[in-house]
Amino acid sequence: MRTGVTTIRHADSSIIKEAQKRSEALGFPYIPRGDTLEEMTEETGLSGFLIYGKQLPLYWSDGEEYRFHMGTAVLRTTQLRKGNPDRLCALLPADGPCDVLDCTFGQAGDSSTMAWFLTGRGRVTALEKSPILYEVGRAGIAGYEDKDESLTDAVRRIHLIHADYREYLAACRDDAYDVIYFDPMFRHPVKRRENDMEGFRAAAAYDSLTVEILREALRVCRRKVIVKERPFAGIFRDPIFTDVRMKRGQ
């Protein structure tokens, strides 16, 4: 997948300079904006573009767009505030300091929910291998604002790193984090028209989770490793897992 950087139509000089700066940082070619993205794709041979403008950058590929949003995080934190449980947060330590490493940042939903839940007693570091999702997420975190100031603060506290979790874990010292979390991309997602995420899927990394990676994660974490996957995932047959919980297909 070859990606370029461009701007909205009729961009002013400040937007163009920002796009050029980010293209250099990401190692993507900067392409001056033409008439249509379809024509630019045909002319350049690129498969998609990160587009910069007056608002947050977005990713475009084959007619599909992906913009920063936090999935169900707003709903989940609202429910937590009302005293209702969250399946992921219920697995985190109930008290004491807790530093979490989210190895699969993706849409930011899980990182944001955990960051809010751990306010005052923990920190979330998130990794994203895809340079596209990292860039959309980096800008999204920095510019995020919600009417709920506690959620705004939590999102902005997330420390997002552009990294492959395999390489990052290998470089970590023993017991560097309390909890390590994996939510790998489903290679065969359930198709729902109302949840069309083709732009996101086109940009995502699809690395397989192995027992070797989990053993490395166990070395790096002090308390537990959490994995979100389909119940039929073969990796759950390995005895490395001490607790498997299934609900609604996960």
PLM features: what roles do these ranges have?
Residues 1-99, 127-179:
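S-adenosyl-L-methionine
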Residues 45-46, 97, 177-180, 222:
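Local beta-strand N-terminus motif with an aromatic residue
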Residues 96-106, 125:
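Conserved class I S-adenosyl-L-methionine
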Residues 99, 123, 157, 224:
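Residues at the starts of beta-strands that form the adenosine-phosphate
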Residues 107-121:
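Conserved SAM-binding loop of SAM-dependent methyltransferases across substrates and taxa
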Residues 184-213:
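Mobile active-site "lid"/loop adjacent to the S-adenosyl-L-methionine
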Residues 210-250:
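Conserved Class I SAM-dependent methyltransferase catalytic core
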